[in-house]
Structures are given as C-alpha cells and as structure tokens.
C-alpha cells in the first residue's frame, strides 16, 4: 500500500474545502436567476435562504456521529455529493418549494462536509506536526472566487443556472473521487465499530470557548459579506459599482493571508498569530466605520479581512489538539458555533439598523472583535501555563 505523504493529504483536504466554496459561490451568485426562474417573492426567498442555514445546522450537529460511524472519507464525499445534487435540483426548480428543498440539501451537505474535512485537516497537522489549517481553509476562498467568476461568465453568456451548476461541479466531482483516497484518517477512527468505545464524552469548556470565539469571528465576517456594500453605498457615499467590491476586497485579502498564515504559525505560534490577527481585524473595522471617505473604508475592509483570516482555522486546530474530546466531536462543536454565527446572526444587523442606523448597527462588530481580542489574551495565558512559563 502506498504511503500517504503530507503534500497529498494537505492537497486532498484543500480540494474538498474548495468544493464547498465553489458550490456556495455558484449558488449565491445565481440567486437572482433562481429567483426569476421560480418567481419567488423577496419574503419567500428569505425563507429559502433560511432553509440553507437550518439544514447546515442539522448537518453540523449530526456529522460527528456519522464520521465516527462511516469515516472521514465517506462523509466528506457524501457531503459533497449531497450539495452538488442540491445544486442540480435548484437548477431544475420552477417552484419555490422545490428551490427550498434544494437549498436545504445544499446546506445539509455543507454541514456534513465541513466537520469531516476539518477532522482531516486537524489530522494533517497532528500527524506531520506542520501548521496547515490556514492553507487548507484557503481552499474555500479559492472555490468561492472560482464559483463567482464562473457564474459571471455563464450569466454573461445567458446560460441557465442548471448548466452553470452541472459543468463545474461535474469536473470537480471527478477530482474529489480521486482525492478522497488521500484524506488522512485519525487513528482513533480507524478502529472497527466493535472496537470503538461506546461511552459519550462530555463537551469540554475549552472546546465551547473556541466555539464562542469562532462564532464571534464569523458574525463579524457575515456583517462584512451581507452589509458591507450597503454601508459603503448608503453611509459612506460610494458609487454602487465600487461598493460592490467590498466583499471581494475582503475575501481576496483573507485568501492571501491564509496562504502565508501557516508559515507565521510555525514561526511565532498559534496564539501569537491569533492575537495579532485580532488586533489587525479590530483596527481594520475601526477604519471601515469611521473613515472620512469611502475609499479609506474600502481599504479598511482589506485590513479587516487580512486580520480575521487566520483566526478560525487556528481555533479548529486548538480545539482538536487541546480540547480533551474525540476529534470529530470537538470539530463538530466548534463548527456548530462558527456557522451558527455566520448563518443566523448577520440578519439581526438589519433589525438594529432600522432602529439605530447602519453605522451604529455595525459598530456592534467592534464589541465582538474586542471580545475576540480578550479571548486571545485568555488563550495566551493558557498557552504559557501549558509551557510552564
């Protein structure tokens, strides 16, 4: 049997993350076309998108048990197949109810894949003792960019969403069928079902702490994704075409940072990179909110994306390494907090904006980022205790 190498394992996890990003990028970019295709009203579309979040939580909640029962490789591939099938159904949908079912399938697949591939990513770091999670998570950013570009091209050519979904996903699926064989499996998950312990482990405080910090991180990212362009246009006076660059600038800088962050982790340590990222993110969002001109605010989003990028991958790595729980359960808990924050909390900024205005509403992110920085200080103290400093 061929020995699995570090490069093969890291690339396999990267590719599965890119599949998730590709599907999300394709789906979100073609929402206007799907809305027109199904005749969905705005409130109906809101319920459709809620189905995405709700189904994701279901997938995240059940993924740990499935990973333990069927393994990392099977659940990663199954999650990918489920959300690719969901995209196929969405492309065929002519009724809102069918689109809602399709969206739920996409969300369910996301949840299952996220936990499984994070388990694989943590195992890459654990087995080869090399910082890798940021590069692996960068696969998601690459997939989102590829999906968005693909959607722009297909939309410009007046190609229906169905074919826009089928062609890129079919190509990537062929790659994943090969890549699954190179996903590393933790030793404790290689036992037969009869050998695996039946006792249920309790969720530890440290894993919950990592989950809360990851949730705060993704709430602020969701605020940038869903409200950043509107803030630049309505509050800072940016032209609509320039305001639309907001999340692209944020995402591009996040991708660039993730590609180098593992080297920084290896050189300076997880907690130091975490703290530095939190400080940079807080400075970036402060620039965004209080800049005198929209161009400076847009630059602030670049700083914000750079600082926020390494935080969540580090939290997954720490939870897997020091959580005191089975790897798949620790990963599931952190993912549930993280994506719960990303999917459910950003819409509340709209409610706050109705009462306080958009500037004050988004100022809540400064409190969250301050809490993230405080959490980093707690992690730093814990790191010193572990090292006996």
Question: What is each model feature region?
Answer:
Residues 103-139:
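Cytoplasmic helix-loop-helix junction between adjacent transmembrane helices
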Residues 29-43, 226-242:
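Short amphipathic helix-loop junctions that connect adjacent transmembrane helices
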Residues 39, 71, 92-97, 237, ...:
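Helix-breaking motifs and short loop linkers at transmembrane-helix boundaries and internal kinks
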Residues 73-76, 274:
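Primarily marks hydrophobic transmembrane alpha-helices of the MFS/SLC 12-helix fold
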Residues 59-71, 155, 257-269, 353-354:
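Helix-to-loop junctions at the C-terminal end of transmembrane segments
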Residues 136-184:
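Helix-loop-helix hairpin linking two adjacent transmembrane segments in secondary transporters
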Residues 53-54, 141-146, 251-252, 256, ...:
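Short hydrophobic/small-residue motifs within alpha-helical transmembrane segments
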Residues 268-315:
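C-terminal transmembrane helical hairpin of 12-TM major facilitator-type secondary transporters
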């Amino acid at each position: 049997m061929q020995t699995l190498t570090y490069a093969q394992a890291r690339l396999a996890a990267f590719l599965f993350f890119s599949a998730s990003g590709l599907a999300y990028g394709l789906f979100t970019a073609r929402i206007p076309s799907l809305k027109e295709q199904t005749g969905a009203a705005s409130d109906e579309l809101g319920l459709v998108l809620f189905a995405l979040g709700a189904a994701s939580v279901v997938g995240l909640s059940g993924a740990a048990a499935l990973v333990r029962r069927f393994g990392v490789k099977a659940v990663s591939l199954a999650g990918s197949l489920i959300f690719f099938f969901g995209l196929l159904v969405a492309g065929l949908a002519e009724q809102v109810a069918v689109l809602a079912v399709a969206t739920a399938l996409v969300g369910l697949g996301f949840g299952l894949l996220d936990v499984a591939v994070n388990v694989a990513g943590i195992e890459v770091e654990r087995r080869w003792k090399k910082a890798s999670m940021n590069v692996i998570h960068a696969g998601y950013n690459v997939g989102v960019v590829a999906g968005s570009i693909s959607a722009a091209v297909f939309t410009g050519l007046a190609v229906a969403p169905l074919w826009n979904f089928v062609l890129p996903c079919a190509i990537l699926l062929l790659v994943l069928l090969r890549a699954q064989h190179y996903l590393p499996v933790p030793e404790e998950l290689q036992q037969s079902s009869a050998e695996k312990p039946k006792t249920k482990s309790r969720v530890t405080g440290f894993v919950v702490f990592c989950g809360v910090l990851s949730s705060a991180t993704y709430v602020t990212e969701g605020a940038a994704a869903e409200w950043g362009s509107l803030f630049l246009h309505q509050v800072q006076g940016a032209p609509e075409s320039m305001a639309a660059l907001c999340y692209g600038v944020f995402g591009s800088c996040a991708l660039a940072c993730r590609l180098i962050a593992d080297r920084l982790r290896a050189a300076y340590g997880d907690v130091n990179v975490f703290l530095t990222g939190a400080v940079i993110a807080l400075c970036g969002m402060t620039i965004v909110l209080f800049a005198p001109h929209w161009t400076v605010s847009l630059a602030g989003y670049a700083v914000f994306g750079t600082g926020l990028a390494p935080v969540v991958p580090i939290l997954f790595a720490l939870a897997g390494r020091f959580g005191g729980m089975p790897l798949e359960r620790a990963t599931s808990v952190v993912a549930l907090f993280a994506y719960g924050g990303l999917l459910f909390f950003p819409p509340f900024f709209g409610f706050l904006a109705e009462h306080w205005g958009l500037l004050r509403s988004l100022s809540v992110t400064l409190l969250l980022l301050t809490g993230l920085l405080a959490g980093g200080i707690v992690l730093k103290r814990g790191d010193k205790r572990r090292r006996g400093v």
